[in-house]
Amino acid sequence: MKSIKLRLVIHYLPMIMFTIIASIIFKLFTSVTDTIVFTTDVSGYISVFFLSITLLIGPFNLIFRRKNPLSTDIRRDIGIYGGILAVIHSVVGLFAHLRGRPWLYFVKETETGFVINLDNFGIANYTGLLATLFIILLVAISNNASITALKASKWKTLQRTSYLMFILVIVHSIYYREVLPEKEILTSIYMFIIALIIVIQLVGMRLKLAKG
């Protein structure tokens, strides 16, 4: 395992630089002027990019017949960084559309009180919230202490919730595409990446089963 200082330099610094460059490009090619909306959008897109990489490392190791250890520094750090961006996306996003009334992301106000919001907007937000909770769990156990405390089998079981998290992200993306059609182009690119990940994951699963 590399030292934290070395990981900050060779893992986190390049990811931060990528985030800055991607944010500048996003700013140049979109008409978003609101800082909160911009931060919500860019943190969401970039977080999915990094979280996607963590789901691709395992299948690629199988495809190219490389060792596929329980945990590696690079996969762990990419997951942590992507998870931090996802949490930023979720927190800042609560102030993107309903300024000062974040509860309306999840409930509707009626004459008699509040009811659970189950339209496209509500489903998008509930799936996003659940995905964020799973991400927080995954980030929290992304360390050697958790592997030691939980033991490898239990830790791996919890780690597999990353697949459920990603399904929730897909649903979240689909429903927000319906709610915010003006983001259709970016969301389409987003969905293409997700589809690519699913295909590669299936290839990896097939190779794993064939390997026995």
What is the predicted function of each stretch?
Residues 1-212:
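Membrane-embedded alpha-helical bundles that constitute the cytochrome b-like, heme-associated redox core
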